[in-house]
Amino acid sequence: MRNLFYILIIFILLGCSVDKNSEVGINPLPNFDAMWDYQHPDSTEIIFIEILEGLKNSAESSYDAEYHAELLTQIARTQGLQSKFIQAHATLDSVKSMLNDNMKTAFMRYLLERGRVFNYSGEWEISKPLFLRAYEFGVENKLDIYTLDAAHMMGIVEPPDKQLDWNLKALKIAEETSDENCKGWLGPLYNNIGWILQGLTEYDQALVYFQKGYEWRTEVGDENGARIAKWTVGRCLRSLKQNEEALKIQKEIQAVIEEKNLPDDGYVFEELAELYLLNGNMELAKKNFTLAYEELSKDRWIVKNQQDRLRRLKKLGDK
């Protein structure tokens, strides 16, 4: 479950960059937020450093100090995602030395990225006050897109009993703001809230949010996201012991994967296996446990964090 949570966080990142001026727009300076590739922070860092070099060589009349500071916060983020934590903090130290009272957005982004680097390095307790300060500052200054981000990060670093409240705060901003940049968070937040409720065994409520997430992904034309969101609906139905409907959904997903010649999905195989096991179809259960093991054993996060899960899949596939 935790891994699916982080997969959807990637969807948040991919879908929620701040579109200040489109690719370039009115401002002659490049919109670096539109150039983010969160799955490839190394190549993104190279692009951002090239922009930085161009900024250093630009005419004094076109220099924008806040833009410079914001760009550096995102360079630090690329470094943090690559586990270059010392370098990331050094980059953020440079930002801190540039800030003044007029740079509200840059200060907000500095807080967020300093917190994220601490969180990436496992020092989440240090990150928490930074995210909280960012949230409060964002509320005070009506910086909705970054306030939402801060609430979302608080929902990650807080203990489980507080995660739901923070995600609901983030969702409230996304639903009520006039900032269209925030709307891309709706689907991922529906997903996150669904998983939190699933973890609290509030399955009926979890299903409501998973269905909202599926509907949102479908409405915006996100086929891959909709397929994953549909999977969460099926997974929740299994928790509600609605196994026939859950199996129907997972078989539909598998049929689409095969029809479109998409990569095999270990999560779908795993869910099919569990459902076949529940209805006593041991032959299909064994087949899908084997397929699930083959795919999920390639997932570095699962290999590192969920060895018991892999051992169970292998054992049930070998029977």
PLM feature segments, named:
Residues 14-15:
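C-terminal motif of bacterial Sec signal peptides marking the signal peptidase cleavage site
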Residues 19-74:
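N-terminal leader/linker segments that initiate helical-solenoid repeat arrays
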Residues 63, 102, 142, 178-181, ...:
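Structural signature of alpha-solenoid helical repeat scaffolds
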Residues 52-57, 93-100, 132-139, 169-179, ...:
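Amphipathic alpha-helical segments of tetratricopeptide repeats
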Residues 289-291, 296-319:
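Terminal, low-structured helical/coil segments at or just beyond the last alpha-helical repeat
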Residues 36, 70-81, 109-120, 146-160, ...:
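Conserved alpha-helical positions within TPR/SEL1-like repeat arrays
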